[in-house]
Regions:
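Conserved short beta-strand elements that form part of the metal-binding/catalytic scaffold
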Residues: 2-3, 42-80, 132-140, 200-232, ...
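Core segments of cupin and vicinal oxygen chelate
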Residues: 15-61, 125, 179-218
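Ordered, small/hydrophobic-rich secondary-structure cores
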Residues: 53-116
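Conserved active-site tyrosine of GNAT-family acetyltransferases
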Residues: 33-38, 131, 188-192, 253, ...
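Vicinal oxygen chelate
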Residues: 1-13, 18-28, 60, 74-171, 208-209, ...
Length: 340
């Protein structure tokens, strides 16, 4: 019988993993990918026939490689998809601990030893049970003096003599989380638990939300097991400053002609606002803001999958970036709340 909660029996290593430092896509939609990521709001760093390199505001990197690049591990699924996730760590001590933890795993590899010791340029990698290359290196993300717009909930006035912003487009702050379909949920959860990931919430036997440290955002990784046995990338989420930037980014992508999968909307489980688009690099891509922040006092909850659990509210098909209404709704000169 499969253990429904494998991580409960595995000690969580107190490792200093900071979050996602880089991801690598492989695609055969090369020029479309370049245009998409520019519209998405990433900063271009390099563009060669073999690789595109982009970054977020805090320096997290997005690499795009050719779909037949021999340096990449085999894909989890056909077509454009994610081939590698790089996690940033605090220091050499963390890398040494991870090297010991991963040394028995399939595909274990250490690059760039310095004087036979692990240093700042070292990459430690292995394949997770689904075959995704998981890499650890010292974090190169930058600290930022950014703040989202405060809100004025009842009884707690935080924004005075200042209007909320209206964004013309988004400029993602960081790579927030990755989500994969798996047919090995128990194995995958146990693998990441040994690396220090902590379970935040779960769909028993169906899915698990995990964060890379006890204190941090609701999840850095979500693993979802479907009845169909589908394997591969679901989506990558990019964190923006606030709900207003979710709207501004989504409306800009709409004006650029990109297709919404779902959104905007709000997830009850993490409290985050979202907007999902179809991505020529593979899977879906999400603007994400205002997720819950957890500590080691948090107790993981259990949910049964369902539409009201996934979304408190959501707009199917998005919002037209020109009319600011759902695409099938004609514009007029009246107020949206005007009686008809």
């Amino acid at each position: 019988m499969t253990d429904p909660n494998p991580s409960a029996h595995i000690p969580h290593s107190p490792l200093g993993i900071e979050g996602i430092a880089a991801i690598t896509y492989a695609t055969d939609r090369w020029d479309e990918a370049r245009r998409f990521l520019a519209d998405w709001g990433l900063t271009p760093l390099a563009d060669t026939p073999e690789q595109q390199l982009w970054e977020t505001q805090n320096g997290a990197q997005v690499l795009v490689r050719r779909i037949d690049d021999p340096s990449l591990p085999p894909p989890m699924e056909p077509g454009p998809t994610l081939r590698e996730v790089v996690w940033g760590v605090h220091d050499d001590a963390t890398l040494n601990l991870l090297a010991k933890t991963l040394s028995s795993q399939r595909g274990y590899w250490v690059e760039s030893y310095e004087n036979n010791s692990i240093g700042a340029n070292t990459r430690i990698s292995a394949l997770d049970p689904q075959g995704l290359r998981v890499v650890f290196r010292q974090s190169t993300k930058r600290a930022l003096a950014l703040q989202g717009s405060p809100s004025n909930p009842w009884g707690q006035i935080q924004r005075v003599d200042t209007p909320s912003p209206v964004y013309e487009r988004a400029q993602p702050v960081e790579i927030g989380h990755v989500v994969f379909f798996t047919d090995r949920l128990a194995e995958m959860e146990a693998f990441y638990a040994t690396l220090g990931f902590v379970t935040s919430d779960r769909y028993p036997g169906r899915g698990v939300f995990m964060r890379c440290a006890a204190q941090g955002g609701h999840h850095d990784l979500f693993l979802l097991q479907l009845p169909t046995g589908q394997v591969g990338l679901n989506h990558v989420a990019f964190t923006v400053r606030d709900i207003h930037e979710v709207f501004g980014g989504g409306l800009h992508m709409s004006r650029c002609g990109w297709k919404t999968q779902l959104g905007p909307g709000r997830h009850p489980i993490s409290s985050a606002y979202f907007w999902y688009f179809e991505n020529p690099c593979g899977g879906l891509i999400e603007y994400n803001a205002d997720e819950d922040h957890l500590t080691d006092a948090w107790q993981a909850r259990e949910f049964q999958p369902g539409p009201t659990v996934f979304a408190e509210w959501a707009i199917d098909g998005g919002i037209d970036g020109h009319t600011r209404r759902q695409p099938q709704v004609a514009t007029s000169g009246g107020f949206l709340t005007e009686k008809r």
